[in-house]
């Protein structure tokens, strides 16, 4: 199991899509932040306010990246990058988890 050390974690979860997507914010001593999330099966559309790197930590997602017409599969251990102020879609048929780093 990979650990994140020397951090503060928000007690309250960020809940989206009627509880089907949930994440917790993790704050580092240097001021940076990540979110760790779990996504129940479904299809969801998200928007970014800043650049992000999404790492799949469990399961897999199909992702429709901004300005793309083709869904791409990202499995455990893979990642994709998103620019600020963009929308993207994810879908999954089983529970999946992610770690989001902000650029």
Curated annotation (Swiss-Prot):
Q: What does this protein do?
A: Catalyzes the phosphorolysis of diverse nucleosides, yielding D-ribose 1-phosphate and the respective free bases. Can use uridine, adenosine, guanosine, cytidine, thymidine, inosine and xanthosine as substrates. Also catalyzes the reverse reactions.
Q: Cross-referenced HAMAP family, in alphabetical order?
A: Nucleos_phosphorylase_PpnP
Show the GO cellular component annotation of the record.
cytosol
> What are its E.C. numbers?
2.4.2.1, 2.4.2.2
Q: Pfam families given for it?
A: Ppnp
Q: Which gene encodes it?
A: ppnP
Organism expressing this protein natively = Shewanella sp. (strain MR-4)
Q: Which SUPFAM superfamilies match?
A: RmlC-like cupins
- Supply the alphabetized keyword list: Glycosyltransferase, Transferase
Write out the similarity annotation: Belongs to the nucleoside phosphorylase PpnP family.
Its protein name is Pyrimidine/purine nucleoside phosphorylase
Q: What is the lineage of its organism?
A: Bacteria, Pseudomonadati, Pseudomonadota, Gammaproteobacteria, Alteromonadales
Q: Which reaction does it catalyse?
A: a purine D-ribonucleoside + phosphate = a purine nucleobase + alpha-D-ribose 1-phosphate; adenosine + phosphate = alpha-D-ribose 1-phosphate + adenine; cytidine + phosphate = cytosine + alpha-D-ribose 1-phosphate; guanosine + phosphate = alpha-D-ribose 1-phosphate + guanine
| Entry-linked InterPro entries | Ppnp (IPR009664), RmlC-like_jellyroll (IPR014710), RmlC_Cupin_sf (IPR011051)
Recorded GO MF terms: guanosine phosphorylase activity; purine-nucleoside phosphorylase activity; thymidine phosphorylase activity; uridine phosphorylase activity
Which positions form S-S bridges?
none
Please state what class of enzyme this protein is: transferase
